[in-house]
Amino acid sequence: MIARLACVILLALAMVGQNAPAPKSQAGFRIAGTVVDSLTRRPLSGARVSIFASENPEFSQRVVADAVGRFEFSALPAGKYTLMGSSQGYRSQGYHQHGDYFIGIAVGPDLDSEHITFRLVADARIDGAVTDEDGEPVRNANVQLYQRTHETGRPSTRQVFSAVTDDRGRYLFSHLGPGTYFVAVSARPWYAQYPNPGEPALSAEEAPRLAEERTRLDIAYPLTFYPAAEDSSGASALVLHPGDRATADITMRAVPAVHLRVKTGESAERKDGMTIQRGFPRVSQRIFEGTMVSVMSSQGFSASAGTYEYTGIAPGRYIIEMSSPGGKPRGGWYREMDLSGTVEIDASENPPLASVTGTLTLEGAPRPGGKIYIILTNRLTSETLAAELTPKGTFDFSEMEVRPGTYDIVLNMAQGFQIKDIVARGARVNSKTLEISGGSVQLGLIATGALGRINGTALGDDKPVAGAMIVLVPRSPTANLTLFRRDESDSDGTFSLRDVLPGEYTVIALQDGWELDWANPTTLQPFLKNGTPVDLTGSAKLNVRVQVQ
């Protein structure tokens, strides 16, 4: 069962102290069991347990476990239920939760829903101190926590939390789940001083002395990863298990700052007697698998019309980019390069960003009410861009110009529709994947409301298996990441894969697959031969039986 955690948590908060009436159906079944610690199996007295009807979001109930961790919900109609639990030191979580998926509880005749052992996973935490080369605390440093998961089907390291160090240089991340984490710190030396173009000229006697002093203070901290790496490839992973307490102290090392001058060729505008600049070039760097992060320690200013200067940047490899002024087509640009010492770049010598526009045609069903968005996701950086669909069926990404790269394209807020065809001018299409090199791109998208559904049962030795990872694998998986579907088999072994575009697929069920690169064709190959092939046409509903591997 796929989790709808945001909705579930909001509902739980709204329903505190309340029990919504049961849906109108024959009642008489129970969900009962014991809440325990996942490692020690110690009963958790006072744990909070909630259920939500999968097909009726208005129905929910909440109880508190007794002195021996027992809980019970009675007089329930047959159906599927989401089971959630929390306690002191245990964040809210689903039953056998894996990322956004968990085991749903099936209730009905001949189904055992009364002997549940709900193993809550204790919170973990990471704390530490950020210091400089002399062991002094670095105050007000920005500390970022990254987690590596396989939620996208391949290793993906993304920021999950951030914190600011206190006056002792300390930070804390609490209420963490098990997993692999990395800590990074961005800061500016408190004593750093950077050249100011507005300062008055100095005398011949003062200039050499001040120049020497400024050289000593013209420094920056690189983005630093635990324990003291200046590149994410050298970061040490913190592998947390339930209830772990990890310490990650980080030492920052000051280095001579880069001086970057960017000439955009843009002329300033004047309005009401004031000079108006159209924003600053952005300075970013890639970390881990390609995630883009802004350089928060940099300090930029406009030296003159069309010229920008940056200080406070440590030597390294960066991306400098700027959107087109005033939304002019083909005006945006980017450049990835190594920076050290004093560097000047000219916008006219840099590759252009792409200006993406297009149309969307909806087939097979009326257009849903409300706003609809077209989403572009960069395969390398995971950067997501959104453009709103107009009432006339057009969209425009020109205000957030697109970097060259490979993109997946999907719809958001268009329930019941999936993109089936993509036509592009100025870009290359490979099935459901878009390869953009720059310049002007026009897209023609067709989305269909004729979507199917695949229901099934995961089996092991001809018996239903709960908690298996179910993966719907499309043909040519590399070019069709948006067609993958996943679920976790429920307590009766059943699963449901919704909003499936017609086509040929293979359904596989994996007993211990949650840490696999499930979208990698090489990883999938050994499992596909024992999967269940399906050929979905139109809005058909199929029922399949899948052997757990």
Where do the language-model regions lie?
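Long luminal/extracellular ectodomains of secretory-pathway precursor proteins
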Residues: 2-549
